[in-house]
Amino acid sequence: MTKSAADSSKSFILTRRNCGQYLGKNMEIPINCRSISAETFFNKSVIRSVVFPYEMEQIGSKAFQGCSRLSEIELPEYLGRLGTGAFSDCVSLKKVEIPSGLTNIPKSAFNNDRKLSDLKFSSDSHLVSIGPSAFSECTSLTEVIFPESLEEIDDRAFYKCKKLNKVSFPEGLKIISKQAFYFCGLNSLELSDSLEVLDESAFFKCCNLTHVVIPPNVRYIGKWVFHGCNRLKYLEIRHDPDFIGEWIINKAATIRCYKGSRIDRYCQETGFKVEYLS
């Protein structure tokens, strides 16, 4: 290990100016370090693993971006803030567990971590939102079980996670934003009854989906939401959302709805095939 342990009892912040003495292949951040500032270890390809102190509270923007050989981290239990792109382009990182104190995963936090195959959340997670492109192009992810506290999955959060074939959504989830699961490998989809917004292209080109049921509280269905899902046979909508965008499915698919409903009229106007529910 490189230099570790506290040099004094006084807490301090690691920056680009004072990080040199701790930089090494297997890093152990001092126990009295409470924060790592932006870009502190940016593009430091020498780093293979990092041990953070339990009580560290903040990791800044791009703090470890581009650490191409970093394969092992254990995020601190007391972490309350993670900066934009903190671990993006860490192409060797294999495993991440999101600690309980983190309420938001910011933009591009783990973007392009191509070997990330194991993503877990603390059993007592307080996570509310996953930010834009947070896990985009994490091409080794196969399964994600989201925590019960989660309410929003933002734009492109899991964009082009091509091997992601299984997700489990919590009952409190309200928003799935634009291109959130664009071009993912999902084999099936069970959306939460709490869901209110399915935004534009949310599941665009998820080519393994065959049958999807829209939950009753969804009030907004954005355009192209299931467009490009070439194996999709049926989209079932049993209620009338406030808004329905254009080309929500391919022409080859069929929408199942009630005769005379707003969805029925939408199908007549757009030329989509319809099958009536009884």
What is the meaning of each model-derived region?
Residues F41-F42, I249:
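Residue-level signal for alpha-helix termini/capping positions
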Residues M1-I13, G20-S35, S45-Q58, S68-R81, ...:
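Structural signature of tandem-repeat unit edges
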Residues S37-T40, G60-A63, G83-A86, P106-A109, ...:
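Consensus positions within tandem repeat domains that build extended binding/scaffold surfaces
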